[in-house]
């Protein structure tokens, strides 16, 4: 496997992934720039868009890690991004939440995309990015134990059956050790509700992302069920965009290195195997 650091290759990979086609096993595209990212001023989003941006320029080729192997700690979020050179901070200008870290190549691509969107009157902000195992455990257990209501209900009261309770949470939240957010490749953009993307402003953003995000390597991985032959997994998330040049690489490695013995250490973990969460929610 070789790594190709061109945005043209990224676009091919992302478009293939977004259309449901498997990526070329022989190529993993990883965009990485040695230059610091620059940020631009956001115009008023009510202004009419200017001409569409030109396709991004090519980036330099980068070396793949030894053996092209993704270490287990990256797959399950067992890292501190502030101490890991694989991660970078999202510039404050492009943040809409408190989760500031992402895989450095994904951050670079997101900044490029946000800059080009801004120049055309579209404001993109990451409201969530990397989450550690501990972060995801807190989200999951708050829902599992009724601290955070799900659909207006405390699931520890309304849904005592462990498998049924896990399935309800899995509509929109991942089990710890199974979230794509562990990889730092996935960004929640602008809002965490599908209803927002049906508003005038939200639809405008979503339409731009649908048309242009693949140019930068991003794909909406949780599209509407049934629309693209996706019978299982999470419900549609119009806000969730994945940087496929790196994420597809991690996804290929995940079922090789992560077994159900690794999906443990949180309330409700015993349901993971019964649900076959790796097959139905990760792959």
Label every model-predicted segment.
Residues 18-283:
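Extracytoplasmic cell-surface/polysaccharide-interacting catalytic and binding patches
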Residues 1-27:
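Sec-dependent N-terminal signal peptides
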């Amino acid at each position: 496997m070789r790594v190709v650091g061109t945005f043209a290759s990224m676009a091919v990979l992302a478009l293939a992934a977004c259309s449901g086609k498997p990526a070329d096993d022989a190529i993993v595209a990883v965009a990485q720039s040695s230059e610091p990212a620059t940020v631009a001023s956001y115009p008023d989003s009510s202004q009419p868009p200017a001409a569409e941006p030109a396709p991004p320029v090519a980036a330099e080729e980068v070396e793949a890690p030894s053996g092209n192997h993704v270490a287990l700690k990256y797959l399950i979020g067992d890292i501190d991004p502030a101490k890991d050179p694989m991660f970078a901070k999202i510039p404050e200008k492009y943040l809409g939440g408190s989760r500031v870290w992402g895989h450095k190549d994904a951050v670079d691509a997101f900044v490029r995309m946000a800059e080009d969107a801004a120049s055309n009157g579209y404001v993109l902000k990451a409201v969530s990015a990397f989450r550690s195992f501990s972060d995801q455990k807190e989200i999951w257990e708050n829902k599992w134990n009724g601290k955070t209501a799900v659909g207006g209900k405390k699931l520890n009261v309304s849904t005592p059956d462990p498998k049924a309770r896990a399935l309800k949470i899995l509509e929109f939240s991942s089990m710890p050790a199974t979230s794509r957010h562990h990889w730092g490749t996935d960004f929640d953009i602008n809002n965490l509700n599908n209803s927002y993307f049906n508003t005038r402003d939200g639809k405008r953003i979503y339409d731009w992302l649908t048309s242009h995000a693949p140019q930068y390597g991003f794909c909406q991985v949780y599209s509407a069920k049934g629309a693209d032959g996706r019978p299982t997994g999470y419900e549609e998330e119009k806000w969730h965009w994945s940087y496929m040049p790196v994420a597809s690489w991690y996804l290929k490695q995940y079922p090789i290195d992560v077994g159900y013995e690794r999906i443990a250490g949180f309330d409700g973990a015993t349901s993971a195997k019964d649900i076959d969460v790796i097959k139905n929610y990760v792959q």
